[in-house]
Regions:
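Specific transmembrane alpha-helical segments of multi-pass solute transporters/efflux pumps
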Residues: 19, 56-91, 95-96, 132, ...
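Helix-helix packing/entry segments at the starts of transmembrane helices
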Residues: 92-98, 163-181, 212-248
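C-terminal-most transmembrane helix of multi-pass membrane proteins
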Residues: 2, 42, 135, 236-285
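Glycine-/small-residue-enriched transmembrane alpha-helix faces in small-molecule transporters
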Residues: 1-38, 71, 79, 124, ...
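Transmembrane alpha-helices of multi-pass small-molecule transport proteins
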Residues: 29-75, 102-106, 155-159, 175-192, ...
């Protein structure tokens, strides 16, 4: 692998993870209902991604896989904002980060994929981590927020499954449509109150075009230049850094069980990615 493309890929996935990791802090800085935040965040992300994607809309294939990606993405982002407003940033991102575990389960149930030993260990380890995160008391709305965050992770897992069947469709175009769907999902709960202050508008543009849009553009740059394993492992910086920014800026400290459970979930996902890469490397020999 040439050094320059590899270095660009590493810089891109690091930039993507850093960009995504600012979500929790930005959500806390905006004093608006969650679905109003999500509507504007997805609107600005849709416009940004459509602008960057440019031409190529004729290559978008209307198929069950593409529709699955669009709808599951829309639910993922809307639910994630609700979760961040209902529980701690650490709980929200760590529970959403269980998406790869849902992929294993859905692969076995929906696609009849036979689970390997690494899959079973990953699911078991993630369940232990989840129980620790969910056991931590996080206020009157924390239980609901945890459930919403877990559902967001489930939807993200469904999106990953659907992406296997939508590989012919350009990613940025599909994500732009997913953000449009997220806007439409949130619209009934926001209508007719669309008013914003100047400060709120600034943070929402930063969330949509910067935190979400730039993150996905950098991801596409990294995917073209790095092995899938390295993309997956560096992306794990997001759930690690997300609560750090919130703690430094807002003093929101994750509990001991949340940190322990989160560490288990992140390590389990990293272990599974390494085991999967080793399996494919062995098959290529």
């Amino acid at each position: 692998m040439e050094r320059r493309p590899y270095a660009i890929g590493i810089a891109a996935i690091l930039g993507a993870a850093l960009s995504w990791s600012t979500a929790g802090l930005l959500f806390k800085l905006i004093d608006l209902p969650p679905l109003k935040i999500s509507l504007y965040r997805s609107l600005f992300s849709c416009l940004f991604l459509a602008l960057v994607a440019g031409r190529g809309w004729r290559e978008v294939r209307v198929s069950p896989g593409t529709l699955g990606v669009i709808l599951s993405y829309a639910f993922t982002v809307d639910l994630f904002v609700i979760a961040n407003k209902s529980t701690t940033a650490a709980n929200a991102i760590l529970l959403q980060s269980t998406a790869p575990i849902w992929v294993i389960l859905f692969g076995a149930l929906l696609e009849r994929r036979r689970p390997r030993a690494a899959d079973i260990l990953a699911v078991g380890g993630a369940l232990v981590g989840l129980l620790l995160v969910l056991a931590e008391r996080v206020g009157p709305t924390g239980g609901r927020g945890n459930l919403v965050a877990l559902t967001s992770g489930l939807c993200f897992g469904l999106m990953m499954i659907a992406m296997r069947r939508a590989r012919a469709t350009p990613l940025l175009h599909t994500l732009a449509l997913g953000n449009l769907a997220a806007v439409l999902l949130a619209l009934p709960w926001v209508w007719p109150d669309f008013a914003l202050t100047g400060g709120q508008l600034f943070y929402l543009v930063l969330l949509g075009a910067g935190q979400l849009g730039v993150g996905y553009v950098l991801l596409t740059v990294a995917i073209r230049r790095l092995p899938a394993l390295e993309v997956a492992l560096f992306a794990l910086l997001e759930p690690v850094l997300n609560p750090v920014w919130v703690f430094l800026a807002r003093g929101e400290r994750p509990g001991a069980m949340v940190m322990a459970g989160g560490a288990i979930v992140v390590l389990v996902i990293a272990f599974h990615a390494l085991a999967t890469a080793r399996r494919y490397a062995g098959a290529d020999r």
